[in-house]
Amino acid sequence: MKEKWLMALASEWDDVKPLITTALESGFDCVVVSRDHIELVRELGSIRIACFGRERGSEDLLIMDTSVPRENQIKSVEKIGRPIGGYVEIRSKEDELFATELGKHVDYLLVVGTDWKVIPLENMIAALQGYDCKIISCVRSSEEAEVALSTLEHGADGVLLDTRDPSEIKRVQAAAERLGMSRIDLKTATVVAVKPVGMGDRVCVDTCSLMRRGEGMLVGSQSRAFFLVQSEAEESPYVAARPFRVNAGAVHAYIRVGDKTRYLSELKSGDEVTIVDKDGMTRSAVVGRVKIERRPMILVEAEVDGERVSTLLQNAETIKLVSHDGTPISVAELKPGDKVLVHVETSARHFGMSIEETIIER
């Protein structure tokens, strides 16, 4: 997830308080403030605080003061030690080269351009790819934020918004969320078997987000094959809609989170999960609660590209897969020949990470 920072260096607290409050409400990750305001920020809420200075204070992250001569900055940051940030204004090629060298010695490199938009940022992103440094691009609008976050394939690691407009803070949050979405390839699988298998422990994942019809999570018994299990976004004659919930399946099952997998049984409050819709568009959500209960289970097997894949779900009419045309289909009505959406990967998994290895899972 891209980081969102707010520059809030006005000397008067009343000038920055509404901006910081909006940043907190919008899920920003860090605010850059004067040291006089550190404790006032902490009274508002929990957010990382960065300050400019020559030595550490009570802030969470020190950013090397720009008044330190450039020839001494790298020595100074090495003496102070990590975590530490650097700040460079890019006005020339010389500035770009200095920023790149400084980035090799800091955790965060804050860069602000004067008459440039993309090219120096591209150069720094490419030059610092092998270093443990996050590039934070200073911007003044959501339009500039979109450019910074999408530069090259990777984009900047985050943006530092310098604005006096609370509405711009919300627009940057929306832009970052939009750019954080990606598409995953979904295929159509043909159901070949549906079989009740008795009792088992199943996992309900209650998130802090509301899902729509056709949205859910990718779950499966194999680490490289996942069924799109829809959220409980629809009402039924038996129970009210719970659009924050995915009744995801048995405790042994894998769930795809980002580009990795986890066991359903491992999930807990505060974890991040990936929501996927019928078109393969993804977004992140936070787990609010996980419920594991003993319930009757049903085995669903399907074939895709000549391969058989499976998952175990609770045997209940409210549990739904997503059909090839995007409509939900209850496991209580599922039958051989039905078409459902799945995601299949070519590589196996080891500790949740994709690897090139021969693994047989049945």
From Swiss-Prot:
Keywords: Amino-acid biosynthesis, Aromatic amino acid biosynthesis, NAD, Oxidoreductase. InterPro entries: DHQ_synth. Transmembrane segments: none annotated. GO terms for biological process: amino acid biosynthetic process; aromatic amino acid family biosynthetic process. Its EC number is 1.4.1.24. It holds the Pfam family DHQS. It catalyses: 2-amino-2,3,7-trideoxy-D-lyxo-hept-6-ulosonate + NAD(+) + H2O = 3-dehydroquinate + NH4(+) + NADH + H(+). GO terms for molecular function: 3-dehydroquinate synthase activity; dehydroquinate synthase activity; NAD binding. Belongs to the archaeal-type DHQ synthase family. Catalyzes the oxidative deamination and cyclization of 2-amino-3,7-dideoxy-D-threo-hept-6-ulosonic acid (ADH) to yield 3-dehydroquinate (DHQ), which is fed into the canonical shikimic pathway of aromatic amino acid biosynthesis. This is 3-dehydroquinate synthase. It comes from Methanothrix thermoacetophila (strain DSM 6194 / JCM 14653 / NBRC 101360 / PT).
